[in-house]
From Swiss-Prot:
Keywords: Disulfide bond, Metalloenzyme inhibitor, Metalloprotease inhibitor, Periplasm, Protease inhibitor, Signal. Residues 1-24 form the signal peptide. Inhibitor of the alkaline protease. Inhibits SMP by formation of a non-covalent complex with a molar ratio of 1:1 and shows a high specificity. This is Alkaline proteinase inhibitor. It comes from Serratia marcescens. One of its GO terms (cellular component) is periplasmic space. GO terms for molecular function: metalloendopeptidase inhibitor activity. Belongs to the protease inhibitor I38 family. The gene is inh. It is found in: Periplasm. Its main location: periplasm. The keyword Signal applies. Gene3D superfamilies: 2.40.128.10.
Length: 124
């Protein structure tokens, strides 16, 4: 019985450590780390947007500047950005998610539908 409790305690302790390590590895990028010029592209066009280091507390996101109104034409809404542990979300003014871009190497990808995809890439 004592051995069973010891094994159970070790297993539970191991799960807690694993959870902490997993949670620690999924850090959210800061506004400063995403700040700068980015390119949004699909099969027909590409345009530049800019992430600013200003946080938007009402949406839990970061300020995004779309001077060419590229994203507004795709999503028909004002867009702000939000970071996720495994990608970047484009948010509406109320904080709801319009699109999520998953990390794919040095860029982020959003699959809109069958064959249609948007990519988001930081410009150096």
């Amino acid at each position: 019985m004592k051995g069973t409790l010891t094994r159970a305690a070790l297993a539970a302790g191991g799960m807690m450590v694993t959870s902490a390590v997993m949670a620690g590895s999924l850090a959210l990028p800061t506004a400063q780390s995403l700040a700068g010029q980015w390119e949004v592209a699909d099969s027909e066009r590409q345009c530049q947007i800019e992430f600013l280091a200003n946080e938007q507390s009402e949406t839990n996101g970061y300020q995004l500047v779309d001077r060419q109104r590229c994203l507004q034409s795709v999503f028909a809404a004002e867009v702000v950005a939000g970071a996720g542990p495994d990608g970047i979300a484009l948010l509406q003014a109320d904080g709801s998610t319009l699109a999520f871009f998953s990390r794919d190497g040095d860029l982020y990808r959003n699959q809109l539908g069958a064959g249609d995809a948007l990519t988001l890439k930081a410009l150096a």
